[in-house]
C-alpha cells in the first residue's frame, strides 16, 4: 500500500488543493490523546500533513512533541489552510477548542497570527519564517541557506553542462536567499555554473512544479533542484534520468536512482522546548534562528550518484561553516548584473538575509518572480 500511495501522490494532491482553493475552506485533522486535562497545542499547515515536504517535516515535529510528552499534551493540526483571511477563522476555532499554543508554519499566516495574538493574550503564538513579534507572539526559522548551499555543491558536482534548474515558489527574501545559496554551492563544485529559475507562485502545486521541471530540462538544465514542497520535480527527474536535489524532507523514495540529497529541517526539539515552556509558565517571546550547529538544519541521506570525492568536499565545507571560518554570504559577492552587493570582508547579517531582493551572479531569472 505504501509503495502504491507514493506513486499515486501527485494527482490526488492536485485535486485536493484545487477543491480547497475553489471552495474556500480548510481541511482539518487531528491526531492526539484525548485526556481532558491535557495541555493543548496546535499546528497550522499550508499543505497536507503528509506532503513529503515542508508540512510533513513540521508534522514530524508535532509527533516528536506528542511522543515525548505523552498524555500530558494533546496535539492537533489543521492542514491545507489557505493563506489569507481564512487563516483567522482557523485560529479562532483552535482557540475555542482550548489550544494554548499555536504554531503557524507558513509566512502567509502571519497577518492573522498578529491579529489573533492581540485578541487572545492568554494564548501563545509562534510564527515560522515570520517577521513579527509581540508579548505572546514569537518567530522562528533556521539557516536553511547553509544546508541548501551544501546541497548545491552536490548538484554542481552532478552537472555536465553547467546549467542547473531550480523550481521556486514565491519571490520573497526567504526563497531568494535559498536560490542564491544553491547557486553559490553549485559554483564551488562546478565553477561558472548557471542556475535557471522558474517561479510557480505556489508553495505546493505538483502540476505546476512538474511543468516547471519539464521547462527547465527543455531549456538545457541537466540537474534539478527545488524550494517547493511536493516531490513532483523529483518524480519527473527520475523519469528522465536527471539528478535531483530535494528540499524540506528526505524524499529519496520518489527518485531512488536520481536522488542526490536535500536540505532538511529538524523542528521537533524546538517545538518540544516551546510547548514545555508554555506548560510550565516560562515561555517568552523572541526570535529563534536554528543552525547546522544545533542540528536544526542539515542534509538528508546521499543518493547513489554522489561520489566519495563530493562527500568529502561537502564535509570539509560543512566543517568550515560550523567553525565560522567560512560563510557563503561573505563578500565579495556580485549580483546578476555584475554589481558588487557584498564587499570584501563584509558578512551579511540575518536581518540583511531577511531583506534580500537580489540574485547572485550566475542565476538566470528575475528576483521579482
Annotate the PLM regions.
Residues 1-39, 367-369:
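Short, low-complexity disordered leader/linker segments with a strong preference
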Residues 31-369:
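A residue-level marker of the well-folded mature domains of exported/periplasmic proteins
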Amino acid at each position: 500500500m505504501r509503495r502504491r500511495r507514493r506513486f499515486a501522490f501527485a494527482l490526488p494532491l492536485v485535486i485536493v488543493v484545487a477543491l480547497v482553493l475553489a471552495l474556500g475552506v480548510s481541511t482539518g485533522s487531528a491526531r492526539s490523546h484525548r485526556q481532558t486535562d491535557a495541555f493543548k497545542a496546535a499546528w497550522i499547515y499550508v499543505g497536507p500533513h503528509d506532503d513529503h515536504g515542508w508540512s510533513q517535516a513540521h508534522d514530524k515535529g508535532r509527533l516528536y512533541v506528542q511522543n515525548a510528552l505523552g498524555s500530558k499534551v494533546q496535539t492537533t493540526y489543521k492542514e491545507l489552510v489557505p493563506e489569507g483571511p481564512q487563516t483567522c477563522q482557523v485560529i479562532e476555532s483552535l482557540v475555542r477548542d482550548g489550544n494554548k499554543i499555536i504554531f503557524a508554519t507558513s509566512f502567509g499566516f502571519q497577518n492573522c497570527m498578529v491579529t489573533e495574538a492581540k485578541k487572545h493574550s492568554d494564548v501563545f503564538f509562534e510564527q515560522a519564517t515570520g517577521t513579527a513579534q509581540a508579548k505572546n507572539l514569537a518567530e522562528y526559522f533556521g539557516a536553511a541557506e547553509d544546508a541548501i548551499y551544501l546541497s548545491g555543491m552536490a548538484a554542481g558536482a552532478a552537472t555536465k553542462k553547467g546549467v542547473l534548474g531550480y523550481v521556486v515558489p514565491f519571490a520573497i527574501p526567504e526563497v531568494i536567499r535559498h536560490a542564491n545559496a544553491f547557486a553559490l554551492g553549485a559554483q564551488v563544485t562546478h565553477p561558472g555554473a548557471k542556475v535557471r529559475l522558474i517561479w510557480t507562485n505556489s508553495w505546493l502545486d505538483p502540476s505546476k512544479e512538474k511543468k516547471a521541471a519539464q521547462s527547465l530540462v527543455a531549456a538545457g538544465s541537466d540537474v534539478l533542484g527545488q524550494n517547493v514542497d511536493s516531490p513532483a520535480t523529483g518524480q519527473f527527474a527520475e523519469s528522465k534520468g536527471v539528478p535531483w536535489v530535494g528540499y524540506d524532507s528526505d524524499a529519496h523514495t520518489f527518485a531512488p536512482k536520481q536522488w542526490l540529497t536535500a536540505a532538511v529541517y529538524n523542528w521537533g526539539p524546538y517545538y518540544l522546548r516551546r510547548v514545555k515552556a508554555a506548560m510550565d509558565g516560562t515561555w517568552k517571546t523572541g526570535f529563534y534562528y536554528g543552525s547546522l550547529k544545533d542540528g536544526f538544519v542539515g542534509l538528508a541521506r546521499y543518493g547513489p550518484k554522489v561520489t566519495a570525492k563530493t562527500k568529502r568536499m561537502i564535509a570539509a565545507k560543512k566543517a568550515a561553516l560550523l567553525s565560522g571560518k567560512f560563510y557563503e554570504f561573505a563578500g565579495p559577492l556580485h549580483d546578476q548584473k555584475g554589481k558588487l552587493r557584498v564587499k570584501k570582508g563584509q558578512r551579511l547579517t540575518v536581518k540583511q538575509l531577511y531583506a534580500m531582493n537580489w540574485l547572485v551572479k550566475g542565476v538566470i531569472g528575475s528576483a521579482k518572480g
